[in-house]
Design a protein with these regions (language model features):
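A solvent-exposed interaction/effector surface
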Residues: 1-150
Length: 150
């Protein structure tokens, strides 16, 4: 994956600045897609992971998959995500409402599932059905999982 990164605080934090950080990051990244070598077209990703231990700050990478290494455009970085099993959820509706889907995953589904979060990065998956402000928009949110107790 190759893209632009930022740090932010999520909706569950008193320091929530998601709305100030992520839309401008995507606004900078999308016009620069043509600068990235070896892209796999059709899907962009948002990669969400803790910024470090013992912090509620999160690190976010707005990115696209690449088929192989190439020169990194200025200010961009490459990231490889190890293979993992993911639980994938569909979010329908405007992007501004995705927090409801994420809250469901973490406060309902994960608590009753036989799996647990494997502590890898979460993925936002933006394909051709994604239209940020449309009520008909579709995107996916995926969390890495492992069987509970492992």
């Amino acid at each position: 994956l190759v893209g632009l990164a930022t740090h932010f605080y999520g909706a569950d934090s008193d320091k929530d600045n998601l709305g100030q950080k992520l839309p401008p990051l995507w606004a900078k990244f999308l016009p620069r897609l043509g600068e990235i070598a070896n892209t796999v077209p059709g899907v962009c990703y948002g990669v969400v992971a803790p910024a470090g231990p013992h912090t509620e700050e999160l690190r976010y990478l707005a990115c696209i998959e690449v088929s192989g290494p190439g020169p990194l455009p200025p200010g961009m970085e490459a990231m490889e995500i190890p293979a993992s099993t993911y639980a994938r959820f569909t979010h329908r509706g405007p992007a501004q409402n995705v927090d409801a889907t994420v809250n469901y995953i973490y406060s309902s589904w994960l608590l009753s599932a036989s799996q647990s979060h494997s502590l890898g990065p979460d993925l936002e998956i933006y394909g051709s059905q994604y239209h940020p402000t449309s009520a008909d928009s579709v995107m996916h949110y995926a969390i890495p999982i492992t069987q509970a107790g492992r």
